[in-house]
Amino acid sequence: MLKGGAPMKYQVFSDMDGVLVNFESGVLKHMNERFQEIANNQEEYKALRGSGSSDYKLYKLARAAARELGGWDVEINKWHIARSDQEGSLGRNKRIRDLMYRLVEDDVHLWANLGWERGGKELWDYIKDIPGLEILSAPMAEGSKLGKKIWVERELGLPVEKVNLSDSKKPYGVWNGKQGLLIDDRDKYVNEFREGGGI
């Protein structure tokens, strides 16, 4: 019985991406739009060569991703940006993932406006009244941190003080003298959390 009656001995944390927030759909939509925009304007991007322009660097990343995909006309899908090594995709899709990070890591607007994960609202409705509930999410760059905080304030109504953004979840396994309980979709972070004493 969690709703409204979670034992106070646990510090409960919920992840965002893949749990409450639909990272995958929003990122794929954004990536494919930008990828096609670059594909349609290659000559303009090529003209920036030697200028030190960040747009030219972006073009080079997109060009490498296009080679990896097998062409500019291939749609980037969830397997291209998979966060785990399902079907050995990490090794095959390195340039595509590099492009993803370049396009989204610092985009405040993107992070602030991602949609809900399927079942995310229902999960939130179930857990939101747990005493002391906090968000624990791994960020990318500074823009992702700000965007995540905006999303949490708007969608969840939580103050930013309840938003923990960290590359490692291990330190949160025991938090404020309580054993932590983490809701997360990624084994990497669940294992880190357990190493820190959490469940």
Regions found by a protein language model. Give the residues of each.
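Short hydrophobic segments within beta-strands
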Residues: 15, 136-138, 183
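A structural signal for isolated positions on well-ordered beta-strands in alpha/beta enzyme cores
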Residues: 11, 132-134, 181
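Conserved Lys-Pro-Asp/Glu-containing loop-to-beta segment of HAD-superfamily phosphomonoesterases
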Residues: 163-194
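Anion (oxyanion) recognition and catalysis
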Residues: 128, 194-197
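A short, structured active-site edge motif that brings together acidic residues
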Residues: 134-145, 149, 154-173
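Short, acidic loop-to-helix structural element flanking the phosphoryl-transfer center
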Residues: 71, 88-135, 142-146
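Short catalytic/ligand-binding loop motif for oxyanion handling, primarily in non-cytosolic enzymes
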Residues: 21-24, 28-30, 133, 142-146, ...
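Active-site neighborhood of HAD-like aspartate-dependent phosphohydrolases
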Residues: 4-103, 195
